[in-house]
Amino acid sequence: MHNIIQRPMAINGQVVIRPMMYLALSYDHRLIDGKEAVTFLVTIKNLLEDPSRLLLDI
């Protein structure tokens, strides 16, 4: 994970500044299929965006 920094984003046709962080995943394609790796990364992204999901296990 990288630092959280303020970056411009287009939201509803407006440019707004939002906190953003890059998240990367490395995996060995001989052991793990790309679909499972992406599914895992999306799950981590969703939990970071809404930690209450992790605490409430939903």
Curated annotation (Swiss-Prot):
Gene3D superfamilies: Chloramphenicol acetyltransferase-like domain (3.30.559.10). Binds 1 lipoyl cofactor covalently. It comes from Pseudomonas putida (Arthrobacter siderocapsulatus). This is Dihydrolipoyllysine-residue succinyltransferase component of 2-oxoglutarate dehydrogenase complex. GO terms for cellular component: cytosol. Its EC number is 2.3.1.61. InterPro entries: 2-oxoacid_dehydrogenase, 2-oxoacid_DH_actylTfrase, CAT-like_dom_sf. It holds the Pfam family 2-oxoacid_dh. GO terms for biological process: L-lysine catabolic process to acetyl-CoA via saccharopine; tricarboxylic acid cycle. It catalyses: N(6)-[(R)-dihydrolipoyl]-L-lysyl-[protein] + succinyl-CoA = N(6)-[(R)-S(8)-succinyldihydrolipoyl]-L-lysyl-[protein] + CoA. Belongs to the 2-oxoacid dehydrogenase family. Pathway: Amino-acid degradation; L-lysine degradation via saccharopine pathway; glutaryl-CoA from L-lysine: step 6/6. E2 component of the 2-oxoglutarate dehydrogenase (OGDH) complex which catalyzes the second step in the conversion of 2-oxoglutarate to succinyl-CoA and CO(2). Signal peptide: none annotated. The active site is at residues 29, 33.
